[in-house]
Structures are given as C-alpha cells and as structure tokens.
Amino acid sequence: MKKIGLLLTIFSLCLGCLGLVPSDKAHAGNLNLTTWPSASILAVESRTVNNADKKLGEIGEKLDLNNSPLRSFRKYRGMFPTIAAQIVDNAPYEKVEDVLEMPGLTEEQKKLLEANLKNFTVTKTADVYNEGDYRLNTGSYD
C-alpha cells in the first residue's frame, strides 16, 4: 500500500512538473499607478485618537507635572528619583510655580526646580495617566 502511494505521488509530481495537468492562469493585480482612490473614499476614513494621545497633544514637548510618569524626569539632571518622587507625591498642581512650595525642599533642590520651570507645564489630571499608580511604575524597564 505504501508503494502504491509513493508511486502515485511521484507520478503526480512528474505530471505537474511537465505541465500536463490543466490549471488556471494566475490573475495579476492592477498595477496602473496613475489610478488613485477616489476622494469620497478618503473622506470617509476617520482616525480615532485615544485619551492618552489626546493628552500628549495638549502637553507638547514639556513635562506635565500632574500626569507625567516618574521615569520621565530622568531627562533633567538631578531630578530623578528624589525630586521626581516628591513632585509625583505632592501632585496635583494648579500652576507650575506651585512645585516650589512643596514641603521638605532644600535650597539646592529649589534652585534646580527654578532652573527647569521652563520645561514643565501643568494640565488637569487625566485618569489614563493616574489610575493604578501608573505614574510610579509604567511597566517599561529600559
């Protein structure tokens, strides 16, 4: 039985390689590059934006004192982890200058914060960044 199966397989392969088995021709796609999709199709497509991306659009390049995770403060020398943890623990803030009124700041820490005030912004707290201690541990370990 195995020999019959083997012979049938070899015979089928030989016929297929010789082209004796009838088959349909392949149908190629339309490669005409001058045809563009109609404008009506493009107008229907919409882009959805999640809440986290929407908040990032509000913030821009600055670091949001009410919503940024602890690890984001690493890009400012001397801020991570001590001052950054104090900022996160004492949030929310009404304005950027409120960060200078945190309890327990040394004069050196105040000077460091004053030097970086231009890099900070304050927006309303967003649940997407503050629920579940996300600001303390974002889950990215680089």
UniProtKB/Swiss-Prot annotation:
Annotated localization: Cellular thylakoid membrane
UniProt record, GO biological process: photosynthesis; photosystem II stabilization
Gene3D superfamilies: Photosystem II 12 kDa extrinsic protein
Keyword Transmembrane helix listed: no
GO cellular component annotations of the record: extrinsic component of membrane; photosystem II oxygen evolving complex; plasma membrane-derived thylakoid membrane
Main location: membrane
Presence of the UniProt keyword Protease in the record: no
Signal sequence, renumbered to the chain: 1-28
Keywords: Electron transport, Membrane, Photosynthesis, Photosystem II, Signal, Thylakoid, Transport
Membrane topology reported for the UniProt record: Peripheral membrane protein
Similarity-based family: Belongs to the PsbU family.
Biological function: One of the extrinsic, lumenal subunits of photosystem II (PSII). PSII is a light-driven water plastoquinone oxidoreductase, using light energy to abstract electrons from H(2)O, generating a proton gradient subsequently used for ATP formation. The extrinsic proteins stabilize the structure of photosystem II oxygen-evolving complex (OEC), the ion environment of oxygen evolution and protect the OEC against heat-induced inactivation.
Subunit architecture: PSII is composed of 1 copy each of membrane proteins PsbA, PsbB, PsbC, PsbD, PsbE, PsbF, PsbH, PsbI, PsbJ, PsbK, PsbL, PsbM, PsbT, PsbX, PsbY, PsbZ, Psb30/Ycf12, peripheral proteins PsbO, CyanoQ (PsbQ), PsbU, PsbV and a large number of cofactors. It forms dimeric complexes.
Name of the featured protein: Photosystem II extrinsic protein U
Protein source organism: Trichodesmium erythraeum (strain IMS101)
